Swiss-Prot record:
Compartment annotation: Periplasm
Annotated organism of origin: Bordetella bronchiseptica (strain ATCC BAA-588 / NCTC 13252 / RB50) (Alcaligenes bronchisepticus)
The protein's role, per its UniProt record: Participates in the translocation of lipoproteins from the inner membrane to the outer membrane. Only forms a complex with a lipoprotein if the residue after the N-terminal Cys is not an aspartate (The Asp acts as a targeting signal to indicate that the lipoprotein should stay in the inner membrane).
Name under which the protein is recorded: Outer-membrane lipoprotein carrier protein
Gene3D superfamilies to which the protein is assigned, alphabetical: Lipoprotein localisation LolA/LolB/LppX
UniProt lineage: Bacteria, Pseudomonadati, Pseudomonadota, Betaproteobacteria, Burkholderiales
SUPFAM superfamilies the record matches: Prokaryotic lipoproteins and lipoprotein localization factors
Leader peptide range in chain numbering: 1-26
């Protein structure tokens, strides 16, 4: 369960949507991602997430909704099979686990500076924090692989599959060799109200500052 929560925290970043400025057939995966980062400042959508161990064992699938607003604001709400909420207000990242009655608080730079969140929610150049390479097309998507330059990032690589200038699937291999796949759907670009990224810990919960 602890490892599942860590994966969910790492992937709270994967709320995405994009509007194409050029046809997808003319753009590489890198160009499509660059277009997404440059043109989509906010979006909402849904996700489904599954995790497989190096031995092939599967963890319970997760599903929920997300929202983001650049730079660095996002909301990742797991609804099934248990509730979990991860919210960044651009300065701090709050992870709330209702069943544990606990809120974990991290500074946003600490939480997403060199994580996959920086790819989709940040505003910097991808090549500054990641070594990026192209992958063969697969499952109707164009793919790229990003490997963190920081050895302490907590994951070894993240593959991003794109279609029509929209990230559609993310596959992350973490430090334990687990592969977490996130499927994105119902992507709706547009400004998201600031209230979506405000979080106040409920009374009675433990608040742990990292």
């Amino acid at each position: 369960m602890h490892m599942i929560r860590r994966a969910a925290g790492a992937l709270a970043v994967f709320a995405v949507a994009a509007l194409a400025a050029a046809p997808a057939w003319a753009a590489t995966a890198q160009e499509q991602l660059d277009t997404f980062v440059a043109t989509v400042k906010g979006a909402t959508g849904s996700f489904k997430q599954s995790t497989v161990s190096p031995q092939g064992a599967t963890q319970p699938a997760q599903s929920g909704t997300f929202a983001f607003q650049r730079p660095g604001k996002f909301k990742w709400a797991v609804q099934l099979p248990y509730e979990q909420l991860i919210v960044s207000d651009g300065k701090q990242v709050f992870q709330y686990d209702p069943d544990l009655a606990q809120v974990t608080v991290r500074q946003v730079d600490q939480a997403i500076g060199t994580s996959p969140a920086a790819i989709l929610f940040g505003a910097g150049q991808l090549g500054q924090a990641f070594a990026v390479s192209a992958l063969p097309d697969r499952d109707g998507l164009q793919w790229l692989r990003a490997k963190p330059r920081n050895a302490d990032a907590g994951f070894s690589q993240v593959d991003i599959g794109l279609r029509d200038n929209q990230p559609a699937r993310i596959e992350l291999v973490d430090a334990f060799g687990q592969t977490t796949r996130v499927e994105l759907s119902n992507l709706l670009p547009g400004a998201v109200p600031a209230s979506e990224f405000q979080f106040t810990p409920p009374q009675g919960v433990d608040v742990v500052k990292m």
